[in-house]
Amino acid sequence: MPSTPWLPPQAAAAVRAAVLEAVRRYHRHDVLIDAEPPREPVLFVGNHGFGTVTDPNVLAVAASLRQRARQQTYLVHDMAWTLGVGGLVAAFGGAPASEESAVEAWTHGRDVVVFPGGDREAGKSWRDRNRVMFNGRSGFARLAMDHDKAVVPVVTAGAGEGAFVLTDGERLASAVGLDRALRYKVLPVSLSVPWGLSVGLSGLLPYLPLPSKLVTAILPPMRPAAGEDAAGFAQRVEDAMQSRMDDLVANRIPLLG
């Protein structure tokens, strides 16, 4: 599944820097560091806003980690490779979401970044825009436990306001076989730029998010408690992220921040 990056490293770095600077300006992005991450390679765990690889939350996390000495590998849904854009994802540090990809990154001294909510969180409706939704997924916690890596939660508020999602379209995705063809379980019905009212387009394809203010908080590192299993650890991470999200949006005005 891994593919050759479409861009040479220097070109990819230049494009990445330009995009992240654009995100900082367009979204008036603020970064709050609740605690400095450990110096050694870690597992950063983020939440989705809306969309897949073009989700502003993914870009916000990348922008938040720009000054870190280590590079990051982003674990990405294999749909990117199914659709033939794996080379583009790889050029910007993406790799198929697997234990093998994570271990390879850590072996080379890179951090790993994962968004456990996956497609369901990335396609959530407007009413759920401020919810962290891992849907019982605990693979990331097991990964960190098996390889003795700290989990560093990263929470971003605001990206769910970049489009108006009427419904996640989970039943529709199942009806048309999207879950079987691409392992993608939602087909959002949304209003977005440039797609207007669409079914699935702004979830699967790039869209121009509205200029909502983004705020990212980097939380203190977390490790499993004595006797805690992966499910319990994952739930504790999700709860910590939701608590921080609640703080970030307590007095928030949509789009304005």
Regions flagged by a language model, labelled:
Residues P2-V15, E104-G257:
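Non-catalytic C-terminal accessory region of glycerolipid acyltransferases
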Residues M1-S101, G169, G203, D246-G257:
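Membrane-anchoring hydrophobic helices of lipid-metabolizing enzymes
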